[in-house]
């Protein structure tokens, strides 16, 4: 530490530059011992960083509840129109899609590559890799609604329907939990439907190596065969760097298998670059079996991962991609 009376002028090589800068700032702002304040601020940052990383993922839940509040307000304001209109929720969907699309652009510089592979009309089954938090799919649904004017139905886990307050959100955005016959009916009606075969298990267990956790699930393939629709593979680059899960530990895996509820804590919320890639559609083939189609689809999703994702994923690299 140098004396404040010591000159910080030109030629004083013995005086460290940063110390001189601190003393100048102390004089400008009239604050004594600025260096101590800065050291204390640095200490607070070190202490609270882990807490911030654990809290940030729940900001997404906060945004979902804001969306739900908006939908309730919208419903009350349009209660009389409901009896006369079959498109009561179109205005709400457009508003919510615009807000989520804006969040995607600002926080993640979100992009979709291969949007032309989504049909303008007619059915298709979208199969996607499930991140720790599927925020990429929320963004993707917003893009589909804005650019295609279509609502993409999605199969959600049973526990999602038990979350307090979520029923209206799930209803407005056409989420369902099955069964297989319902999925086939939706596709035969000409709608888009999305399924993540890995589901919550993949969200919890997969990690920065982006291993696909589908087990022996092939029900989605049977749905595509029964409905005679193409399958479109989908993967979002850096989704595991945006949010990370501790669900791969033995305790949290046991808890999930026992109670079928994701108890594992998450951390992240980093503003990494997110790019969703849509692969070439896998056309309907009446000669293929569900097992063969499931394996073919898994290979297609894996090909997207191999082509577009750095393995293992790196949070800092994903952040720097925002500037590329």
From Swiss-Prot:
Entries under CDD domains matching the protein: LPLAT_MGAT-like
Cystine bridges: none
UniProt catalytic activity: a 1,2-diacylglycerol + a 1,2-diacyl-sn-glycero-3-phosphocholine = a triacylglycerol + a 1-acyl-sn-glycero-3-phosphocholine; a 1-O-alkyl-2-acyl-sn-glycero-3-phosphocholine + a 1,2-diacylglycerol = a 1-O-alkyl-sn-glycero-3-phosphocholine + a triacylglycerol; a 2-acylglycerol + an acyl-CoA = a 1,2-diacylglycerol + CoA; an acyl-CoA + a 1,2-diacyl-sn-glycerol = a triacyl-sn-glycerol + CoA
Record's keyword terms, sorted: Acyltransferase, Endoplasmic reticulum, Glycoprotein, Lipid metabolism, Membrane, Transferase, Transmembrane, Transmembrane helix
Keyword Ribosomal protein: no
Cytoplasmic side: 72-125
Root EC class: transferase
EC number: 2.3.1.-, 2.3.1.20, 2.3.1.22
Sections of the chain in a coiled coil: none
Pfam families reported in the protein's UniProt record: Acyltransferase
GO CC annotations, alphabetized: endoplasmic reticulum membrane; membrane
Activation/inhibition comment: Acyltransferase activity is specifically inhibited by TMX1 at the endoplasmic reticulum, restricting accumulation of triacylglycerol.
TM spans (from-to): 51-71, 126-146
Origin: domain of life: Eukaryota
GO BP: any one term: triglyceride biosynthetic process
Membrane topology: Multi-pass membrane protein
PANTHER family: MONOACYLGLYCEROL_DIACYLGLYCEROL O-ACYLTRANSFERASE, TRANSMEMBRANE PROTEIN 68
Function: Catalytic subunit of the alternative triglyceride biosynthesis pathway, which mediates formation of triacylglycerol from diacylglycerol and membrane phospholipids. Synthesizes triacylglycerol at the expense of membrane phospholipids, such as phosphatidylcholine (PC) and its ether-linked form (ePC), thereby altering the composition of membranes. The alternative triglyceride biosynthesis pathway is probably required to provide the energy required for rapid growth when fuel sources are limiting. It maintains mitochondrial function during periods of extracellular lipid starvation.
Similarity comment: family membership: Belongs to the diacylglycerol acyltransferase family. Highly divergent.
Entry protein name: DGAT1/2-independent enzyme synthesizing storage lipids
Organism this protein belongs to: Homo sapiens (Human)
């Amino acid at each position: 530490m140098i004396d404040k009376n010591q000159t910080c002028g030109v030629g004083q090589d013995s005086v460290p530059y940063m110390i001189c800068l601190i003393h100048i700032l102390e004089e400008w702002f009239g604050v004594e011992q600025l260096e101590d304040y800065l050291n204390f601020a640095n200490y607070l940052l070190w202490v609270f960083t882990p807490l911030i990383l654990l809290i940030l993922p729940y900001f997404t839940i906060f945004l979902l509840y804001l969306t739900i509040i908006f939908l309730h307000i919208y419903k009350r304001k349009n209660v009389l129109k409901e009896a006369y209109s079959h498109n009561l929720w179109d205005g709400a969907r457009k508003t919510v899609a615009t807000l989520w699309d804006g969040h995607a652009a600002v926080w993640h510089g979100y992009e979709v590559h291969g949007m032309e592979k989504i049909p303008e009309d007619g059915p298709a089954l979208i199969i996607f890799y499930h991140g720790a938090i599927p925020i990429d799919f929320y963004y993707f649904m917003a893009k589909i609604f804005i650019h295609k004017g279509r609502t993409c139905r999605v199969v959600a886990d049973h526990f999602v329907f038990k979350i307090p307050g979520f029923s209206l959100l799930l209803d407005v955005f056409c989420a369902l939990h099955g069964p297989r016959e319902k999925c086939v009916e939706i596709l035969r009606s000409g709608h888009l439907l999305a399924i993540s075969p890995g589901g919550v298990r993949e969200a919890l267990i997969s990690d920065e190596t982006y291993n696909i956790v589908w087990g022996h699930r092939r029900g989605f393939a049977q749905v595509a065969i029964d409905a005679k629709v193409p399958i479109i593979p989908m993967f979002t680059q850096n989704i595991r760097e945006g949010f990370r899960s501790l669900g791969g530990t033995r305790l949290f895996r046991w808890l999930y298998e026992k109670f079928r509820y994701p108890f594992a804590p998450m951390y992240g919320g980093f503003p990494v670059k997110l790019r969703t890639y849509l692969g070439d559609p896998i056309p309907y083939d009446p000669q293929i079996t569900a097992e063969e189609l499931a394996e073919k689809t898994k290979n297609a999703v894996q090909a997207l991962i191999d082509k577009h994702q750095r393995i293992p994923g790196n949070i800092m690299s994903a952040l720097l991609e925002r500037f590329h």
